[in-house]
Amino acid sequence: MIKDIKHLIEPMDFTVEELDEIFNLAHQIIAHPKEFSHICDGKILATLFYEPSTRTRLSFEAAMMRLGGKILGFSEPNSTSISKGETLADTIKMVSIYSDIITMRHPKEGAAKVASIYSNVPIINAGDGGHQHPTQTLADLLTITSLKNGLNNHRIGICGDLKFGRTVHSLIKAMSRYQNNKFVLISPKELAIPQYIREEVLAKNHIEYIEVEKLEDVIESLDILYMTRVQKERFFNEEEYLRLRDSYILDRAKMDLAKDDMIVMHPLPRVNEIAYEVDEDRRASYFKQAEYGMYVRMALMIKLLGVM
C-alpha cells in the first residue's frame, strides 16, 4: 500500500514495491475496466500544459474520464493569467483550490518540484524540460513487464537523442533499479548521454553499458530497442537539428537483423526515425505502449487520490 506519497515528480518517488502495486492495478484495470469506471466520480483533474502535448495530455484526460472524473485546465498558457505575469506558485495555489489532483508539463527543469511545494493536492510531473517524464517511464515499465515477462535481465538499446531526451534519462534511472539489466547507448557524439547519467546512475549502480554510433552493429543483440526522435524544440541551431535529425532510421532492413522476440518502443511522437513499414512488424510495440500509458495513469491517479 502506498502511504504518504502526495506527488510524483520522478520515478524514484516510488519504491520498487510501490511501482509493482501500480502495475498490478493497471493490469486489473485492463482486465476489468467496468469495475473502475466510477471510482473517481466527483474528482477533478487539472491539466496544466505550459508546453505543447498531444498524447500525454489526452492520455491523462482519457484516464480520468474513464475513471468517472472530470477535467479542467489549459494547453495554451498565453490564454491564461500566466501571460499577465502570474507566477507558477500563484497558479498552483489557485488551481489546487479547484481540483483534486494536478498534472503539469513545463519547459523548465525542476518546475514540478516547485509546484509540489505550493500545492495542496497531488502533483504529477508530465515532463519538466529535459529533466524527467515519470509517467512515460511508468508506461515504459508496464510495457516491458507485460511484453517481456518482467523488468530484470534485459539488454536494452536506446537510440537517437540521448542528450535531451527526458524519457531516456528517466528510463535508465528506473531500469537501473532492477536486476541484471544492460544498456547499449546508440547516438551521435553530439547527442550522447549526459555525463551525470553515466556517473550518478550507471557507474554508481555498477550497471554494464556501452556507447556506439551505429544501430546496425548492435541491433541483433538487443531484447528491447527504445527509439527516440531528435527534438527540434531543444535546438537553437536549425542547421544542426537538420543534420542530426536523420542520424538513425529504423527500417525493415535493420529489423531483419534483430531477434524474433525483440520489442521496439518509442515514447512518440515520431518524425521519421521509424519507417512506417515497421508498423506492420509484430515486434513494433509503440502503439501498445501508448495504450499502456493510459492504463498506468489511471492506476497512478487511483493510488495518489486514495480512492482505493
From Swiss-Prot:
A Pfam family: OTCace
To which pathway does this protein belong?
A: Pyrimidine metabolism; UMP biosynthesis via de novo pathway; (S)-dihydroorotate from bicarbonate: step 2/3
**InterPro entries xref list:** Asp/Orn_carbamoyltranf_P-bd, Asp/Orn_carbamoylTrfase, Asp/Orn_carbamoylTrfase_sf, Asp_carbamoyltransf, Asp_carbamoyltransf_Asp/Orn-bd
Residues binding L-aspartate are 84, 166, 229
The record, for PROSITE patterns, names: CARBAMOYLTRANSFERASE (PS00097)
Q: What class of enzyme is it?
A: transferase
Residues given in the record as carbamoyl phosphate binding sites: 55-56, 105, 133, 136, 268-269
State the EC number(s): 2.1.3.2
Claim: Transferase is one of the keywords in the record = yes
Q: Which SUPFAM superfamilies does the UniProt entry name for this protein?
A: Aspartate/ornithine carbamoyltransferase
Its UniProt entry gives the catalysed reaction(s) as: carbamoyl phosphate + L-aspartate = N-carbamoyl-L-aspartate + phosphate + H(+)
User: What GO terms in the biological process aspect are recorded for it?
Assistant: 'de novo' pyrimidine nucleobase biosynthetic process; 'de novo' UMP biosynthetic process; amino acid metabolic process
Q: Which residues form a coiled coil?
A: none
Keyword Transferase assigned: yes
Which GO molecular function annotations are given, in alphabetical order? amino acid binding; aspartate carbamoyltransferase activity
Keywords from UniProt, A to Z, are: Pyrimidine biosynthesis, Transferase
Gene3D superfamilies with a match to the protein in the record: Aspartate/ornithine carbamoyltransferase
Subunit comment for this entry?
Heterododecamer (2C3:3R2) of six catalytic PyrB chains organized as two trimers (C3), and six regulatory PyrI chains organized as three dimers (R2).
Q: Which NCBIfam families does its entry note? A: asp_carb_tr, PRK00856.1
Role according to the record: Catalyzes the condensation of carbamoyl phosphate and aspartate to form carbamoyl aspartate and inorganic phosphate, the committed step in the de novo pyrimidine nucleotide biosynthesis pathway.
Q: Which family does it belong to?
A: Belongs to the aspartate/ornithine carbamoyltransferase superfamily. ATCase family.
Protein name according to UniProt: Aspartate carbamoyltransferase catalytic subunit
Q: Which organism is it from?
A: Clostridium beijerinckii (strain ATCC 51743 / NCIMB 8052)
